Amino acid sequence: MRLNTLSPADGSKHAPKRLGRGIGSGLGKTGGRGHKGQNSRSGGGVRRGFEGGQMPLYRRLPKFGFTSRKAMVTAEVRLSDLAKVEGGIVDLNTLKAANIIGIQMEFAKVILSGEVSAPVTIRGLRVTKGARAAIEAAGGKIEE
């Protein structure tokens, strides 16, 4: 088997419909669009969310809440990810260097998910109560 001999399995690919190629094809003349009307026209059809003049769902439902801009630049870090950081000192820059959080992140919070194996020092990150207990139980410490 070679890359140039690969082909799709029999029956897995269907030929596209050839529209407007005579009445014998079953899709001649109007090409499956019917006669007249908005959808028969070139570029015809209604916009997304349009319900035929009925008040659309996105306008029937109330507005609520907002998107926090701080949440966009805040990352959650699992306890199990802390082992991927070299040196035992974990701060925002070492997390970025280890590709655990994105470069655009400005804040990080360590959460209790997984286990911490080696003692680590956390600097300048927020830590949940459960994660704090697990880090201190493993011999690590948290510096604000």
Swiss-Prot record:
Single GO cellular component term: cytosolic large ribosomal subunit
Region Disordered, residue ranges: 1-53
Pfam families to which the protein is assigned, alphabetical: Ribosomal_L27A (PF00828)
Key words of the record: Ribonucleoprotein, Ribosomal protein, RNA-binding, rRNA-binding
Biased composition (Gly residues): 21-31
Highest taxon of source: Bacteria
GO molecular function, one term: structural constituent of ribosome
Gene Ontology BP, a term: translation
Xref: NCBIfam families: rplO_bact
Assembly information from the UniProt record: Part of the 50S ribosomal subunit.
Annotated PANTHER family: 50S RIBOSOMAL PROTEIN L15 (PTHR12934), LARGE RIBOSOMAL SUBUNIT PROTEIN UL15M (PTHR12934:SF11)
Purpose of the protein: Binds to the 23S rRNA.
Family: Belongs to the universal ribosomal protein uL15 family.
Protein name as annotated: Large ribosomal subunit protein uL15
